């Protein structure tokens, strides 16, 4: 009952052998409330309960989409990287609900793999409760939801980078390696993802965006120069940097 029906809009009562009755589900779903009616503490408690993490969310994304495709998402981008971030399966772990009834958290593809650190729920009335796993994995409805929430997550990260670059840099240190997977794998979102990627600048000795680099290029510089390395320490020690540094690049 707790796993599958805790959030349905009807209380479930269990009567014991002594004749005493008790409601055994919460009969509430936080995501059905208006965001303005939900406190930060309530979001944090739900995030921690839902994800098993102990940090506070870096970004909370709570909205409802209506029309031909109806769904509600309550998503959380963590502050700290989860322990399983680099497991070989690279599974995403969003929970799927249909009309507030829990269906599964093991689909693995409600988000692209490079966003596998995102936690939370998707609730939609546009699927049947008795739908099979095979149908879910090939569902056009879920494909549309995936596309919509991926764009929403990127949009929120764009806003965060613009408004709070210092904390975004801390986020990038935790999740940048994973997000860069999307530059290779996610052709639809590659350009937007590149714009919010942080790259280390030897000249400025800090992480910047590609646009920052272009804006500060020397007047006679026609090319963008980059060095690939296993880590930042190795890159800084590369002898290839000396000539560029001497020329102010």
Feature annotation, model-predicted:
Residues 2-249:
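Conserved GHKL (Bergerat-fold) ATPase module
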């Amino acid at each position: 009952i707790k796993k599958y029906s805790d959030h349905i809009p009807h209380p479930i009562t269990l009567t014991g052998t002594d004749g005493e009755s008790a409601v055994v589900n919460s009969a509430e779903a936080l995501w059905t409330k208006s965001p303005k009616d939900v406190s930060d503490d309530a979001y944090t408690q739900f995030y921690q309960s839902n994800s098993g993490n102990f940090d506070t969310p870096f970004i909370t994304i709570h909205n409802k989409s209506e029309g031909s495709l109806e769904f509600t998402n309550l998503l959380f981008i963590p502050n700290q990287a989860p322990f399983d971030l680099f497991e070989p399966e690279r599974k995403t772990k969003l929970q799927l609900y249909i009309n507030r009834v829990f269906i599964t958290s093991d689909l693995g593809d409600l988000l692209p793999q490079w966003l596998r650190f995102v936690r939370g729920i998707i609730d939609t009335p546009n699927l049947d409760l008795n739908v099979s796993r095979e149908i879910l994995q090939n569902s056009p409805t879920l494909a549309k939801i995936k596309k919509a929430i991926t764009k929403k997550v990127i949009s929120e990260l764009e806003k965060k980078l613009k408004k709070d670059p210092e904390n975004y840099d801390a986020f990038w240190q935790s999740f940048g390696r994973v997000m860069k997977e999307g530059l290779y794998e996610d052709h639809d979102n590659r350009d937007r993802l590149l714009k919010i990627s942080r790259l280390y600048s030897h000249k400025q000795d800090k992480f910047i965006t590609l646009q920052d680099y272009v804006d500060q290029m020397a007047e006679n510089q026609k090319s963008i120069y980059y060095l690939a390395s296993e880590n930042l320490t190795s890159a800084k020690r590369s002898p290839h940097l000396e000539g560029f540094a001497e020329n102010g690049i």
